[in-house]
Structure formats: structure tokens, C-alpha cells
């Protein structure tokens, strides 16, 4: 374990003493440091009628237990404080450590003993994470140190778990959206699942916009998947034009219906544990799946601003600007009289994507988004540089396949009976509009590009993204984060994992940082919390996070690739082609070992190479035919210890998100030896070699200069490392699988790898 503490708010002595007193700690500025520490420790053992017993189980020195120490005349020292602090946080002498000083250095322990600062040290210790993954104060509250009185209690600028999660209100309302996406002449109704604590105070809301939450149709999804085996189409030379079109909602009328009291209820919904954490701290949770999902009406429009509007309508309802009904019969309306109107959205992948889309509407009431692994342009999710390009791990998927997966109205037999025929018509229109034949950008994709509206974002923004996420690739967060207005508060956590959540990792206090931010934004708490704009997980060692100023630098270093002419054959033998088509992982293994159809260049680094931004391959290339697909991957190659991309569980249920509520495992990325690490990758239809909107012809056997931008990253390579460049055509995981007989030739003498370099 290593501390990377970003959530602690430096506190004055007077404020620290006041907060400790509010928690029931009997500390006194007039007492000695030793007396205050003893009083603090005895309070920790509030379950015991006799605190001597648990105190005797701690050691103050290698040859003295804590009880004996406090009964002695010996003075408090750094050695004693450090040893007791470690034990209070769950570290066991002789098991987790033998030499406390060396262990504290390894931990990067954030508290440095000064006898005159003992009150502040105790305050800081309570806000520091235990070995279990919880802060000490959260651990104590979870054990019942504070009663669940359904009111707010704060410590170090963060809300504590004092809301009773055993007496939650679970209710359903149906919000009227200014849409008619299924063209039935009726405004669409949006089902909203609400979970909130009982409270006399208006509550802020965490809203998870999740098209998955009302169920998914995997059977329809699998039937809709596309075969990837097809020839690369030769496109006509042309210029693509699109236009920015404002979304115009339909008119709605003020509701004059009586207020209803009997709301639909539910017992369970698959929740997000970060939401659960905040539910116990006085934040209502709502789950909304939007148009075209079970319990709602409308068509699944998948990514456009009509779908976004169906979530926006819920925020409007929370602020009294939209109508909600008690049921589909629309006999009574219901008002969000429990809400304070301030909302933060949460969730990963499609969920985080909807958060980004919502933020670009500038809707009043949306105070903050926490968007994890989020899409900012749907074209860049299913296409790349004029190519059909599947998200990592999902060859054959496209946006209409996702529509089939999430149109959960068809999981309700009655809805299927009444609406499926019309749904299939709308789905066919969507399939035509996305133009899988060419892979080109068009109006359909432009209408699903949130980047063009980034300037309208006015809420606070928090993004997390994995630099090993080849599903929602790093370009998605790179482009939206760098497009955000300079006038807003923005934060980015870049980790070394894949498509994963990071709130329960051991090495980063993400939950606590979000707590401090949300108390500021949604509860109006003046806590003086300041979070760095960007925090990056160091790839060279375990559990190390660093502040960064920018994602993408203008300083570059050009690396020569060699002097040879390299030939890349596109065609595989029939058996090999079929085998790779059945198992794209086998093709990746062959590719990384240099056993596929490829050009391979190894560069031994003579100095450190700190990459920050978008690597570009500038290549002199020609094709034997009038078409060509170019793929590239950059590897950190050679055996050494690296971070894994999938977090592993260190414990099974050590994190309590309330008071014995929604327990979850503590996780972390492992640090272990492997043979390589993908740094970046990229794909291009050579007919789109100049830009996305220009379709060019490819002259047979004529040299072309191509600039292939790869996925942005921040990655530190060290002197002596090997940078492996792999150039090839078909990628069996991502691109169409064209097995026609053509070849690409690369002139390495006129080619470079252009690397953005991080400044010191």
C-alpha cells in the first residue's frame, strides 16, 4: 500500500479541535500531547465498557504495550505516535511491517509527528485511509460511533454516513419528456427509480443515466452482430459535409392534475456502489434508463440529443420545470418536493457518455458530472479515420446492435406485441443511416458528437479514464477534456487500467475526493477543498499517482524508423484467416510476437521517453491496389514489471459504504512481470489519409505521405527500454477483415515516429 492523499483538507488547530469535539472526542488544548492521544485512543474503543483491555493489545514500543506506556511517565515520541497510528489504521506489527520507519517511508505516510500539533495529527489521522480501504472516521461511523439520525454531519469537509439505509424510500415516477421518439403522437414517458433516505431536509441527487438498468436483450443483440469478414470498399472521391443542428424539443403544457400520494414502489435495483456510499451520506439516488427502455415509452435513438433530452427532462422535473405522473394512466402528478434541485450524474461507459451529453445541454440544476470511461463522439467509438472499427473486445458491434441490446421494451411481451413492428422500421432506418458500408463520418454521427457542444458545459466536470481502455479509447476523454471551457472546474483521473471503475482502489482516495467536491457543489458546504486538475497513475511503479498540468504537449521528439523498404502482405492463408477470425486474441498474440503479416521496428531507447499526448506515425507508403487499410500499435516491449490493466480484489468486503451497508471489495492494479504493454494503437483507411471529411483515391504503387494519429496517452519509458512499432493491415479485433491479395510498402527512410514529450 502507498498513500496518495488528495482528499484531506488542511485545517487550522481551532477548527480541528472543534470538529473533534463535535464527534465526541474529549480533547483539550491545555492537555499534554500524551494525554490527548490516550483520550483519543480510548474513544476509538467505544464498544468496550473497559478500554484498558483493547488498549493493552496495542504496542507503543517494541517492548511495551500501549496501556503500560500511558500508565508510565515516559514522554510521547515520534516512535510511539507512529507505531500507534499504524496500528489504529489496521497495520499489524510483525505481519505488515517490522521496522516502522521504513514502512512509513514505503507508505508515503502523510502525517509527520510534531508534539505541538497533536490535535491536528489526530484530525488528520481520522481522515486517513485504513488498510481496509476506508478512512478511520468512516470505519468508526460504520461501527456505530454516530447514530443514524437522518441529518448531515461533516468531518474535514465531507459528509458522514449518518442516514439510515435500513429505512429507505423506494418509489417510481414517470416523467413526461418533450419528445415523441416512437412517433405515436404521445409525449414519451420516462421511468425513474428513486432511492432516498428519510429526511426533513431537501436532498441533493445522484442520478445514474443508464440505458442498461431496466434490462438488456442479449438475444437480439447477438442476432444483430455484423460479420467482420468483408472486402474494404473502394470509395468514390468526394468531400463530406455536415451541419450543426440544434435539437428542438416539443412543446409541453402545464399540468393541472391533482397531486398523487400513492406511488409505485420497488424492492431492488442493481445499484452502483459509489451511489450507495453517498446514499448513506444524505444524497438521493435515482436511476433512469431513458427512451425505449422497459417501463418508459419511445424509441431507443442511441446517442443523439433526443435520448439526452429524456434524461434532461428528469433534471427539469427535479427543479419543477417538468411534469411527472404516478403511473402511465396519468391521473395524478407528483412533485419532487424532497429534492433541492441540484444533481450530479454518475456512471461508467454508456452511463458516463450520457453524463457528457447532458452536460453539453447546459441544463440548470446539473451541478457536476462524474463521467467514467465516457464516449464524447460516437463516431470515434464505432469508426476510425474512415474505417468501421469495433470497440475493443466486441468485433461486429455497431450502434444499431447497441440499440437492440438496450431497447428493453421488447423484454415486456405486451410492449413487444404492440410495438415491435414499428420498432423494426425505426431500427432499419437507423441501420441505414449509420452507413456501415463506407465507414465515413456523416450527419448521423455528427448528431451524436458532443464535442461540438462542449463550449456549452457550465457544470463542474470529473472524468476518469483508463489508458489501457481499448473499448472506450483514450481519445474520447482526451478530446472532451481539452475542449472544455476554461471557465469551469474540471478534473481528470488517468489510470493504467482498462474499462473499469476506480472508486474502490487502495492507492487513491477517489471516494473521499468526490465527497468533498459534492459537499461543495450540491450541499453548499464552504470546505475550501481544492482538487488538482489532472491526476495520473505512474506506469513505472505500483500505487503512485502524480499531478499533471496538461494532457497533450506541443513539445515533440522525432524517432527515425530505419532505412529499409518493408513489405506488408494483407493476405493470409485460408486456415490461418479463419482461425484468427474465430479468435482475435490468437491474432494479437501472433502480432506481438512478430509472427503475423506485419512490419516490425524495435527502437532501443538511449534516454528516458516521457510520452504525453498523441503519438503520430508519419509514413511514406504505397499500396499495390487502389485501396488500403493501415493499422499500427506501439508497445513497451521486453520482460519487466508492469502494472496490470485489470484490478484484483485485495479483500472481499472490507469497504462498508454506510453503517453495515453495501459492502464491497478493496481493489488495486497488480504490479508484476510481463512481456509487453500496449502503449497506443491506431487505424486508418488510406482513402481518408488527409482528413476525415476528404475521401481521396489511392493510386496504385504511387508513394503517399500518411500521418496516422494514435490514441493519446501518458506513459513513461526509461533508458534501455525497447519501443516496438508494429505496422500491419487487418486487425482481427477492431477492423473489417479483408483478405484480398494486396500489399503495402513502407519506406522507413522517409518515415518517423513523432512523440509528444512531457516537460519536467
From Swiss-Prot:
The active site is at 349 (charge relay system), 469 (charge relay system), 499 (charge relay system). It is an enzyme of class 3 (hydrolase). Signal peptide: none annotated. Keywords: Aminopeptidase, Cytoplasm, Hydrolase, Protease, Serine protease. GO terms for cellular component: cytoplasm. It is found in: Cytoplasm. Its EC number is 3.4.14.11. The keyword ATP-binding does not apply. GO terms for biological process: proteolysis. Transmembrane segments: none annotated. It catalyses: Hydrolyzes Xaa-Pro-|- bonds to release unblocked, N-terminal dipeptides from substrates including Ala-Pro-|-p-nitroanilide and (sequentially) Tyr-Pro-|-Phe-Pro-|-Gly-Pro-|-Ile. GO terms for molecular function: aminopeptidase activity; dipeptidyl-peptidase activity; serine-type peptidase activity. NCBIfam families: PRK05371.1-4. Homodimer. Removes N-terminal dipeptides sequentially from polypeptides having unsubstituted N-termini provided that the penultimate residue is proline. Belongs to the peptidase S15 family. This is Xaa-Pro dipeptidyl-peptidase. It comes from Streptococcus pyogenes serotype M12 (strain MGAS2096). The gene is pepX.
Amino acid at each position: 500500500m502507498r498513500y496518495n492523499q488528495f482528499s484531506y483538507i488542511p485545517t487550522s488547530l481551532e477548527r480541528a479541535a472543534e470538529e473533534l469535539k463535535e464527534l465526541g472526542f474529549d480533547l483539550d488544548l491545555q492537555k499534554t500531547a500524551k494525554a490527548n492521544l490516550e483520550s483519543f485512543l480510548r474513544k476509538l474503543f467505544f464498544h468496550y465498557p473497559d478500554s484498558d483491555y483493547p488498549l493493552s493489545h496495542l504496542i507503543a514500543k517494541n517492548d511495551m504495550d500501549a496501556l503500560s506506556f500511558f500508565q508510565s511517565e515516559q514522554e510521547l515520541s515520534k516512535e510511539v505516535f507512529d507505531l500507534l497510528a499504524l496500528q489504529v489504521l489496521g497495520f499489524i506489527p510483525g505481519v505488515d511491517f517490522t521496522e516502522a520507519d521504513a514502512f512509513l517511508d514505503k507508505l508515503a505516510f502523510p502525517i509527520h509527528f510534531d508534539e505541538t500539533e497533536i490535535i491536528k495529527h489526530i484530525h488528520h489521522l481520522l481522515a486517513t485511509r485504513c488498510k481496509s480501504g476506508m478512512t478511520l472516521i468512516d470505519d468508526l461511523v460504520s461501527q456505530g460511533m454516530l447514530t443514524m439520525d437522518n441529518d448531515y454531519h461533516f468531518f474535514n469537509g465531507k459528509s458522514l454516513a449518518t442516514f439510515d439505509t435500513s429505512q429507505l424510500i423506494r418509489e417510481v415516477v414517470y416523467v413526461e419528456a418533450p419528445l415523441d421518439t416512437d412517433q405515436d403522437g404521445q409525449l414519451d414517458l420516462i421511468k425513474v427509480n428513486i432511492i432516498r433516505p428519510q429526511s426533513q431536509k431537501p436532498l441533493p441527487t445522484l442520478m445514474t443515466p443508464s440505458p442498461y438498468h431496466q434490462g438488456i436483450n442479449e438475444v437480439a443483440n447477438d442476432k444483430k452482430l455484423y460479420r467482420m469478414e468483408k472486402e474494404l470498399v473502394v470509395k468514390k472521391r468526394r468531400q463530406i459535409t455536415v451541419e450543426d443542428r440544434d435539437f428542438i424539443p416539443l412543446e409541453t403544457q402545464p399540468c393541472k392534475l391533482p397531486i398523487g400520494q400513492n406511488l409505485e414502489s420497488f424492492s431492488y435495483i442493481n445499484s452502483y456502489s459509489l451511489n450507495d456510499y453517498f446514499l448513506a451520506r444524505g444524497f438521493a439516488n435515482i436511476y433512469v434508463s431513458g427512451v425505449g427502455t422497459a417501463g418508459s415509452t419511445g424509441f431507443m435513438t442511441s446517442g443523439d440529443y433526443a435520448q439526452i433530452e429524456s434524461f434532461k427532462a428528469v433534471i427539469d422535473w427535479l427543479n419543477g420545470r417538468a411534469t411527472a405522473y404516478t403511473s402511465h394512466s396519468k391521473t395524478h402528478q407528483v412533485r419532487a418536493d424532497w429534492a433541492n434541485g441540484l444533481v450530479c450524474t454518475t456512471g461508467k461507459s454508456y452511463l458516463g457518455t450520457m453524463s457528457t451529453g447532458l452536460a453539453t445541454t447546459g441544463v440548470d440544476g446539473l451541478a457536476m458530472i462524474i463521467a467514467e470511461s465516457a464516449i464524447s463522439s460516437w463516431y470515434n467509438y464505432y469508426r476510425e479515420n474512415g474505417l468501421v472499427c469495433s470497440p475493443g473486445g466486441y468485433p461486429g458491434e455497431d450502434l444499431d446492435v447497441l440499440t437492440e441490446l438496450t431497447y428493453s421494451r421488447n423484454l415486456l411481451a405486451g410492449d413487444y406485441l404492440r410495438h415491435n413492428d414499428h420498432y423494426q422500421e425505426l431500427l432499419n432506418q437507423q441501420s441505414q443511416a449509420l452507413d456501415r458500408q463506407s465507414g465515413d463520418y456523416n450527419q448521423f454521427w455528427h448528431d451524436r458528437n458532443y464535442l461540438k457542444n462542449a463550449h456549452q458545459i457550465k457544470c463542474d466536470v470529473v472524468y476518469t479514464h483508463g489508458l489501457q481502455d481499448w473499448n472506450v479509447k483514450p481519445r474520447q476523454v482526451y478530446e472532451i477534456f481539452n475542449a472544455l471551457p476554461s471557465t469551469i472546474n474540471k478534473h481528470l483521473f488517468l489510470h493504467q487500467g482498462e474499462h473499469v471503475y476506480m472508486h474502490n482502489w487502495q492507492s487513491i482516495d477517489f471516494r473521499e475526493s468526490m465527497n468533498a467536491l459534492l459537499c461543495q457543489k450540491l450541499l453548499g458546504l464552504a470546505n475550501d477543498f481544492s482538487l488538482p486538475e489532472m491526476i495520473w497513475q505512474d506506469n513505472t511503479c505500483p500505487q503512485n499517482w502524480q499531478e499533471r498540468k496538461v494532457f497533450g504537449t506541443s513539445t515533440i521528439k522525432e524517432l527515425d524508423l530505419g532505412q529499409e523498404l518493408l513489405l506488408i502482405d494483407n493476405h493470409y492463408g485460408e486456415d490461418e484467416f479463419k482461425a484468427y477470425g474465430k479468435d482475435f486474441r490468437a491474432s494479437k498474440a501472433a502480432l506481438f510476437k512478430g509472427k503475423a503479416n506485419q512490419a516490425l521496428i524495435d527502437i532501443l531507447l538511449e534516454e528516458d521517453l516521457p510520452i504525453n499526448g498523441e503519438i503520430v506515425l508519419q509514413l511514406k507508403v504505397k499500396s499495390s491496389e487502389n485501396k488500403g487499410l493501415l493499422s499500427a500499435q506501439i508497445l513497451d516491449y521486453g520482460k519487466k514489471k508492469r502494472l496490470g490493466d485489470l484490478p484484483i480484489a485485495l479483500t472481499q468486503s472490507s469497504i462498508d459504504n454506510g453503517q453495515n451497508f453495501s459492502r464491497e471489495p478493496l481493489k488495486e492494479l497488480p504490479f508484476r512481470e510481463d512481456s509487453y504493454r500496449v502503449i497506443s494503437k491506431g487505424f486508418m483507411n488510406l482513402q481518408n489519409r488527409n482528413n476525415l471529411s476528404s475521401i481521396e483515391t489511392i493510386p496504385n504503387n504511387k508513394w503517399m505521405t500518411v500521418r496516422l494519429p494514435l490514441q493519446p496517452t501518458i506513459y513513461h519509458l526509461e533508458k534501455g527500454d525497447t519501443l516496438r512499432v508494429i505496422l500491419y493491415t487487418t486487425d482481427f479485433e477492431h477492423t473489417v477483415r479483408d483478405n484480398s491479395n494486396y500489399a503495402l510498402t513502407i519506406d522507413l527512410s522517409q518515415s518517423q515516429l513523432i512523440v509528444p514529450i512531457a516537460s519536467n
